[in-house]
Amino acid sequence: MGCAMSRLAKMTTALVIIVMLFLPSAMAATVPSIDHTKSQRIPLPGGSGRGPESVAFDGQGQGPYSGVSDGRVLKWNGDELGWTTYTYSPDYKTDKCTLAALTPGTNRETLCGRPLGLQFHHKTGDLYIADAYKGLMRVGPGGGEATVLVDQVNDIPLRFTNGVDVDQITGQVYFTDSSMNYDRSQHELVTNTHDTTGRLMMYDPQTADVSVLQTNMAYPNGSPSATTRHTLWSRPPDRASCSGTGSEAPRQAQQSLLPTNRATLTT
């Protein structure tokens, strides 16, 4: 009896080892791979078409749309038409922004704007823009001059509006202000001084109200993902972590950190 139990234990151990050996490869086989040979490189127009930041597609799958360093948001219309101007801030002046290609970009940004985050509300066709200097903006279907929706919150100006996302069910807009002390041209100071004055906010297009969901954030960067409708994720650019904030109860929002492998994240 004891000998039989010993053989059974050995067989069980061997089976467990075999499963452990093959499980990683089996799991890896279920992860779809990306064929990079099918990717397409789309050059931006010369001159002022530099510094692409976020990329977005509209509800019909058209695009991509991308903000560039002269303050415009461009739309890709295919190989035949190429890039066209889709939207721009109310203060945008062609002669001082697009045609002033020799002027350093940071010198133009306060006038021309610097669109960083982009996201469409697919139901309405509205494009929401997180402009580093202008604040949260919106433009309707078809583009044109954008409208500034939020440029200050609780009487505190937005100094470094960065990321934006839209809840496609409710239409609520989530956006970040990376620092209350420094603007985009001083982004290195945000990192070097370990600034933690960043904010995560929500704009309600039905009421035009703005709620502050989280304060004292360290350089919230990129788009605060609202796709799960439970947690908003934002990643500081210099830290190997993601910041998660509950989105369904903004007045009771709690922030938590999720350690990550820096090599697997892009912003």
Regions found by a protein language model. Give the residues of each.
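Short loop/turn segments that connect beta-strands within beta-propeller blades
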Residues: 77-81, 140-144, 203-208, 246-251
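Blade/loop signatures of beta-propeller domains
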Residues: 10-41, 194-197
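Surface loop/turn motifs at the tips and blade-to-blade linkers of beta-strand repeat domains
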Residues: 42-48, 87-90, 107-111, 149-156, ...
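Beta-strand-rich domains and repeat architectures in extracellular enzymes and scaffolds
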Residues: 40-73
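A short helix->beta-strand "capping" segment at the edge of beta-propeller domains
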Residues: 26-51, 96-107
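Asp-box/WD-like beta-propeller blade repeats and closely related beta-sheet repeat scaffolds
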Residues: 100-116, 122, 126, 130-191, ...
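Beta-propeller domains
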Residues: 28, 60-97, 140-142
